[in-house]
Amino acid sequence: LVMPKDERGGYSLYDINAKLNHRFSEQDRLFISFYKGKDHVYYKYKDEDKFKQTHNWGNILLNTRWNHVFTPQLFSNTTLAYNRYVFDIRQEETSSIQQPDGSTIINGSNNLFHSGISDLSISTDFDYHPLPAHNIKFGAKYIYHQFAPEVQTVNQHNSDNGYPQTNDNYSLNNSHIHAHDFSLYAEDDLILNEHWKINAGLHFSFFNVQKQTYLSLQSRLSISFQATSNIILKSSFSQMSQCTQLLSTASLAMPSDLWVPVTRHIRPMKSFQYAVGVYYTGIKNWEFSIEGYYKDMYNVLEYKDGESFLGSSHNWEDKVEMGKGRSFGVEFMAQKTAGLLTGWINYTLSKSDRQFSTDGINN
């Protein structure tokens, strides 16, 4: 794409990965990993007026994991991690106005929209094999969240024949939200006999934000039945509660999702999912499966009609509606597991819809 001399645009990105592993003994190992990535898009033009827009987004992740073996049946992983995601949009505009007396007035504005989330977490996970038929996993995790859903700063200035006249700075929706997230979990992979396997688990979460505390107890259950040597039947149920959600803006092709937390007014999203599946391995080096699922969702978030993260002084909580939704579908898969050529082909047929009780969103 060739642009005029007064018009420019471009895209760049980079990714950095680093890993370090060290074995202190047969019982203790340390794993350190680092990742940083950033994408940058810009567009600008210049004639009598000037305009420039940049869009940046990226992640940084630092993870330290200590693996300790207590006994041949019990080991643990303790992880300390920091994760940060940000994206921003910056616009700079300058316009010139020629006055009848020959003087020139220059008006300018700099607008910056910034959003992001950073997490500092520590977790301990245990894996325990008391018997060959039992694989028990349990652990705990704490996360300190720092949300910046919407931070907008505006600078407006003008000059007359090079002499500054005004220079105004102000902020819109300069919101920062801090939250404490603590969870406990336990699950057991249990082999009952040669035909039946069960995985059962519980997850407890404590989420504190803006002096409001949300508690939840979530259950998970999956059952597997070996009907024949080549056919396995599976079914599962899972209950989830989510205290952070992604708000998406469909009008922008580039990443523009906002990570937002529950607040005093926004409740956690809850979901209940049911699934069944049939798996067949009767053909050598091939696996086939068909799975169906149904999911109910409550307290889902969507922008009201005409709203987005840009161009409004309203807080993000005033731009969204809470509603309910459902999704269901069926998935087919064929996989070649061995031979000169391996791979898989997958087809999914699904539907998802949302319903809101107010007129703020088209139902």
Regions found by a protein language model. Give the residues of each.
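Flexible, surface-exposed loop regions and adjacent strand-edge segments
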Residues: 6, 37-38, 47-53, 93-109, ...
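Transmembrane beta-barrel architecture of outer-membrane proteins
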Residues: 13-15, 57-61, 117-122, 179-185, ...
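Transmembrane beta-strands of outer-membrane beta-barrel pores
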Residues: 1, 36-40, 82-86, 142-148, ...
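Face-selective signature of the C-terminal outer-membrane beta-barrel domain
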Residues: 21-39, 56-210, 289, 344
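Outer-membrane beta-barrel strand-turn architecture
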Residues: 22-26, 68-74, 128-132, 190-196, ...
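Surface-exposed extracellular loop regions of Gram-negative outer-membrane beta-barrel proteins
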Residues: 40, 86, 151-154, 229-274, ...
